[in-house]
């Protein structure tokens, strides 16, 4: 049987857009997210929203709880077979 390799990755730009949309839906600001996640500065949140980086697994889980969104709703992936 031939093995198929799956090349999967998280799309940081689309993930950031999903986070921003969920924040807007809940009327939460970057400051609200920063405080709720116990971050020392809002820099990480801005980087997520711009698609420069993606949240750690702990932070994306916390965001899903805070934003009442599933991980699937927040994380945007791309798969190349």
Mark where each language-model region is.
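Short amphipathic recognition helices of helix-turn-helix/homeodomain-type DNA-binding modules
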Residues: 73-81
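Short alpha-helical "recognition helix" segments of helix-turn-helix
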Residues: 33-34, 63
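A short, Lys/Arg-rich alpha-helix, primarily the initiator
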Residues: 1-28
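Short, basic-rich loop-to-helix N-cap that marks the start of a DNA-contacting helix
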Residues: 51-62, 81
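Residues within the alpha-helical elements of helix-turn-helix
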Residues: 25, 36-37, 66
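DNA major-groove recognition helix of helix-turn-helix/homeodomain DNA-binding modules
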Residues: 58-73
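Recognition helix of helix-turn-helix/homeodomain-like DNA-binding domains
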Residues: 39-54, 77
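Short coil turns linking two alpha-helices in DNA-binding domains
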Residues: 29, 40-41, 56, 70
